[in-house]
Amino acid sequence: MSWRLPMVALLASLASSAALADSLRVEGAHVRAVPPVSTTTAAFMVLHNEGEADRSLVAASTPAARVAELHNHVDVDGVMQMRRVEAVPVPANASVSLAPGGYHLMLIDLAAPLHEGDEVTLSLTFDDGQTLELEAPVRRIETMNHDQMDHQPEDMSHSGH
């Protein structure tokens, strides 16, 4: 009879760990395509925490780069600057976007050039030690070209020139 209590505690612990593991989900992961001479790029995605506990992304790694760091853009005296951060908070029952201009994963000192269509293995580590492995396609990030800009007639006045 004395073995039942420790066994129940162990099973409850395992079930709790499994529930935490199932609470995190990654969506839309991709790596920015860069020119072949570039040694740095970034990975973007949406982190979903469907659990009841706050979580934090605390580290990342990839065989595609020597260094993978968590970064964010912050306003410093009116100038946006990219800064390394120790963690990306992922609140309970919420989602956090890793996107251009905000949190993102910097891949530094690329092992080889990345081409559009390549797949990059990413390993994401969270504050509880859980690691999520995923494949992220390399994609070209579209930028707005001149034809996509919203030009209003008053904006196009060249008077005084």
Give the ranges of each region predicted by the language model:
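Compact, glycine-rich, soluble single-domain proteins
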Residues: 22-161
